[in-house]
Amino acid sequence: MQADLVLYNIGQLVTSRELDKTKKMDNIEVIENNGYIVIEKDKIVAVGSGEVLKEYLTPATEMVDLSGKLVTPGLIDSHTHLVHGGSRENEFAMKIAGVPYLEILEKGGGILSTLKSTRNASEQELIEKTLKSLRHMLELGVTTVEAKSGYGLNLEDELKQLEVTKILGYLQPVTLVSTFMAAHATPPEYKDNKEGYVQEVIKMLPIVKERNLAEFCDIFCEDKVFSVDESRRILTVAKELGYKLKIHADEIVSLGGVELAAELGATSAEHLMKITDSGINALANSNVIADLLPATSFNLMEHYAPARKMIEAGIQIALSTDYNPGSCPSENLQFVMQIGAAHLKMTPKEVFKSVTINAAKAIDKQDTIGSIEVGKKADITVFDAPSMAYFLYHFGINHTDSVYKNGKLVFKK
């Protein structure tokens, strides 16, 4: 076996390889100094510490001395509303002044504003806008992003969002995992006919699946959005069609969406700021990943999800940006990690696990990405920081030094 690339003299190497089969949040391998990674083509072929075995080296092997830097798997942002038209900075002053969201909505703002902008945008306009976001994410060390639809809310514009996501996968290095989320809100044309829209979403499901445009189906199970019964109907059909499931749940009130996620065997339940003991118990007795979005709580000045309580109950947690034009207009997963430490009281190992192997589990990609292990994709991020603790302590800057995607250098500061 001959190496194309060797990264060596690594300071702290966070492989995120799980050391046992438990759901513990701190059970990941960390090589404390002088680590190395050997890469052949797009795969990792060796990981260790000390001197690299000569059997891997040829005169053509590229040797990169990382001079004691922090190295992790490529970060994974497992919950975003990536593709959307427009922005909502005009609502920011109203929010600061304390204007309620429903009042903003009545003035044509909120999700209705983004709905209009997304419907009016061409595919090319959405591509150009989203490419900028993906570049920001890559520069922050992110190599895989989940992307939801849900700002079209009709067949034509939901397909447009999903087609744009597919095209973007070919135009830049970040891997995109697509989620169909027409059940994000009820569009104005169905304002007085919620049942009609539920049926419309169910009709869209086979069309999206037939075109191979989405791997997951998500729904906003929330008071005055979609009930538990409506969510169950949509997600049951989706599951029968071969979609994997996600659920926005317990964001504003606890409606039973978390319990539904466990009942249906969803891959993840997301938000969870208002999760109850019943919901925690349901997740603890399932394999559902709790995908928490603390930058949304930060931006809305709302309560954070009870991460410590969930961790102590044996729940696996991922952290994501929730990047969207309303409640979290930020692509910065590094900041999310720092909030995770400071406000969710997560340890460095817990934080880094939540954006690597657990984030991979939240998009069902744990067999190929999310950890630095032999046989996995060589998606690797190098940070100009000596340790996980320093990275989390020194907030507000971009720590990324370089990013490797499938064994190729795709970003260098």
Curated annotation (Swiss-Prot):
Catalysed reactions, as listed in the record: 4-imidazolone-5-propanoate + H2O = N-formimidoyl-L-glutamate
Positions with a binding annotation for N-formimidoyl-L-glutamate: 151, 324, 326
Binding-site positions, Fe(3+): 79, 81, 248, 322
Pathway: Amino-acid degradation; L-histidine degradation into L-glutamate; N-formimidoyl-L-glutamate from L-histidine: step 3/3
EC number: 3.5.2.7
Binding site for 4-imidazolone-5-propanoate: 88, 151, 184, 251, 327
Co-factor requirement: Zn(2+); Fe(3+)
Pfam families tied to this protein: Amidohydro_1 (PF01979)
Gene3D superfamilies cross-referenced by the UniProt entry: Metal-dependent hydrolases (3.20.20.140), Urease, subunit C, domain 1 (2.30.40.10)
GO CC terms: cytoplasm
Cofactor note: Binds 1 zinc or iron ion per subunit.
Keyword field: Cytoplasm, Histidine metabolism, Hydrolase, Iron, Metal-binding, Zinc
GO MF term set: imidazolonepropionase activity; iron ion binding; zinc ion binding
Protein task: Catalyzes the hydrolytic cleavage of the carbon-nitrogen bond in imidazolone-5-propanoate to yield N-formimidoyl-L-glutamate. It is the third step in the universal histidine degradation pathway.
Protein family: Belongs to the metallo-dependent hydrolases superfamily. HutI family.
Protein name per the record: Imidazolonepropionase
Species name: Fusobacterium nucleatum subsp. nucleatum (strain ATCC 25586 / DSM 15643 / BCRC 10681 / CIP 101130 / JCM 8532 / KCTC 2640 / LMG 13131 / VPI 4355)
